Amino acid sequence: LPPQHDAPPLEMAYVVRFFWPLALIMAVQSGTRPLINIFVARAVDGTEALAVLTIVYALGHIPYGWLNEVRNLPTAFREANNLAKVRRFIFGCGAFSFVWMAAIVWTPAADYILQNWVGISPELAMHCLIPLSIFCGFPIVVSLRSYIHGIGLLQHRTQAMAPSAPSRVATVILVLSALSDTDLHGATRATIALLSGHTVETLVVWWSIRRGGKEIEVTEV
């Protein structure tokens, strides 16, 4: 980038204001699954559900986990004529991840992988199938969230992203509480709660960024 001689000096207070919402979001994202595990472990089928979740988290994260990194693209390619292309690329990545996951979990390949590659029992594999199917929703939600996060970073509006973190925790707790008296398997309840938390988090950050009514501003380089 060319030097910007007229740019004001960076102040530490501004860095703190910019970073603390990101730190909060990262902390909540890291703590959501342990929080869910605490709820699940207290159920009657807690031990089995935790075993299922350990497998589901590991396998389900493979097709979509990398989508979190595309949030860096709007800032990396921030010229005005690039943003639409970046948006299409991100959503294309989300569609690719969804097809990848669906091709595995909605076909007999899932049962084969669970029993022959992972090496778990047929009964445990059966309990993994529904949670893995629910995980097919994550590529769409995560790709949209990553794009919105990228816009927030581009516009330096990270404080608008902060409310999404507590909304995710609240949603997870509410959904787990609402499903606690159902006959659903513990791992299924946990996966529904996790996807619900991601979805509400994405909606809240979209609303927060959009609420400012600020057009997407880009810097010419």
Describe each model-derived feature in a short phrase:
Residues 99-129:
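Short membrane-interface helical motifs at transmembrane helix boundaries
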Residues 1, 48, 111, 119, ...:
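Membrane-interface helix-loop junctions in multi-pass transport and translocation proteins
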Residues 135-140, 149-176:
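A late C-terminal transmembrane helix in Major Facilitator Superfamily
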Residues 50-103, 145-156, 160:
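Small-residue-rich hydrophobic transmembrane alpha-helices
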Residues 16, 20-76, 100, 135-142:
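Transmembrane helix-bundle signature of multi-pass secondary active exporters and lipid flippases
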Residues 57-60, 93-96, 164-171, 193-201:
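Transmembrane alpha-helical core residues of multi-pass small-molecule transporters
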Residues 1-30, 211-221:
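Interhelical loop/hinge segments that connect adjacent transmembrane helices in multipass membrane
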Residues 11-19, 54, 124, 128:
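Primarily residues marking transmembrane-helix entry/exit sites
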